[in-house]
UniProtKB/Swiss-Prot annotation:
GO BP terms, alphabetized: translation
The name this protein goes by in its record: Large ribosomal subunit protein uL29
Mitochondrion is among the record's keywords: no
Alphabetized SUPFAM superfamilies for the sequence: Ribosomal protein L29 (L29p) (SSF46561)
Keyword Nucleus: no
Top-level taxon: Bacteria
Gene3D superfamilies: 1.10.287.310
UniProt-listed HAMAP family: Ribosomal_uL29
Keywords: Ribonucleoprotein, Ribosomal protein
GO molecular function, one term: structural constituent of ribosome
GO cellular component: cytosolic large ribosomal subunit
């Protein structure tokens, strides 16, 4: 789980990279769930919320410019 304070310290490029890596991880988890290989389905929820948290902070930084 990524903390909001950690994300706020990153610049816009770093946040965009973070969102992309989280989206790739979320896609992999969804594929594991579809093939019934995912044991802990709670990771889908936490990854989805991490993506939303990163996108929110990214939007805040872009609006501040």
């Amino acid at each position: 789980m990524t903390k909001a304070a950690e994300l706020r310290q990153k610049d816009v490029a770093g946040l965009e990279a973070e969102v992309k890596s989280l989206q790739k991880a979320h896609f992999g988890l969804r594929m594991q769930k579809a093939t019934q290989q995912l044991g802990n389905t709670n990771t889908l929820r936490t990854t989805r919320r991490d993506i939303a948290r990163a996108k929110t902070i990214l939007a805040e930084k872009q609006a501040a410019k």
